[in-house]
Amino acid sequence: MPHNQPATLSTSQSVRLWPVLSILVLVVTALVGTGCQSDAAQSAGTSAAKSTTTTTASQTDAAGTVWLCRPGLAQNPCDGDMSTTTVTASGQRTVQADPVGGEKTYNCFYLYPTASNESTVNSDLTVQSTETADATAQAARFSRYCNVWAPMYKQVTVSGLGQANTTDPGAYTVAYDSVLADWTDFISNYDKGLPIVFIGHSQGSIMLIKLIQSQIDNTPALRKLVVVSIIAGGNVVVPTGQTVGGTFRNIPLCSATQRSGCVIAYSSFPSQPPADANFGIPGQGISLNTGQTATTGVQVACVNPAALGGGTADLETYWPVETPLPIPSMAPPAPAVTTPWLYYPRQYTATCESRDGASWLQVVPVGATGDTRPVVNEIAGPTWGYHFQDINLTLGDLVADVHHAESAFKG
């Protein structure tokens, strides 16, 4: 597959792909800004760490990198209270205490999805509440097993998506150059040779694909440091029926026998994606932002986080209470609890499916009698599937995968 700059989308592709995302993120931004949260969020107090909305000296290092998350950072959104209320299908509740973490000898490098709400095409590096909310929702629970590093980058903003995908594809180059500078700072000054876990979603996955292609895939010394890469909602591709090749030449997909040094990639849908889906089908949608234009001979990768070896498995679904990001996608409202996290066991199962040129993680409700827990829906329509919930639907599984990958890496 080509490793060139992102292809320019046609006007029709851009019109279909981005306006819904813009509207949704602007709604979420309004919720964050006005403090409009669910009853659960209002009852949870302030136990989860929150970042300020301005850049401070403690966040900016000598190289100019602004860290959304890093070890020792005051008000670190990736290292808060992880105590959790478990709510079963019958409504029974139990509270899990914040797990005590041991010494962390691995680093996690996290790139957040589209969140910036500036009016420019590319964001500045000021930390906003939307980026903080994403970091808490997606990356914080990994801090049990690794030191989470999350740089701010000059991502394409919500309002800039349409322009970036039609008349200004160079905006993605600006974003990637920013990520590359952050990575160079991290690997030169902070990693100190420790093993690395990569985590990305949506635009973060676009950037992570390009970073791994240019810096890791063909560099054995760095490749051997990678424990596992989680690339959700990004359309990693492989040759049809294969586990290596395509997006990455030397890095395989994870499997039952390959638990480290590999990639976990998927996009979640409740059923088969439509022919014009933005995810799960090669050569279209988000694939175009990484220059992956091939439509034949390849398939979008699907690795089930709950069953790396394949098959159907229950999902370990975790939702942050205080961030409003998942709230617009769930009904009825989440139950009021006193912990910053909710865990819904045995609510969904997942299976990787492949049919008619599409590959996807099919997420299906267990459907227990009397289950009144909030359910996810396709808030942006069938072409997006469960994209906005990709990480949280599988979060407990992904954290366990990282833990198992670290064990395999050691051994």
What are the residue ranges of the model-derived segments?
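N-terminal secretory signal peptides that target proteins for export/translocation
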Residues: 1-16
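Extracellular mucin-like PTS domains
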Residues: 43-57
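Short glycine-enriched nucleophile-adjacent loop
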Residues: 69, 207-216
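Bacterial signal peptide processing site
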Residues: 37-39
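Gly/Ala-rich beta-loop-alpha elbow adjacent to hydrolase catalytic centers
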Residues: 200-208
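Surface cap/lid and interfacial helix-loop subdomains adjacent to catalytic sites
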Residues: 178-193, 213-376, 381, 389, ...
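Active-site catalytic motif of lipid deacylating hydrolases and related acyltransferases
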Residues: 71-74, 100-104, 110-195, 358-411
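C-terminal motif of bacterial Sec signal peptides marking the signal peptidase cleavage site
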Residues: 32-35
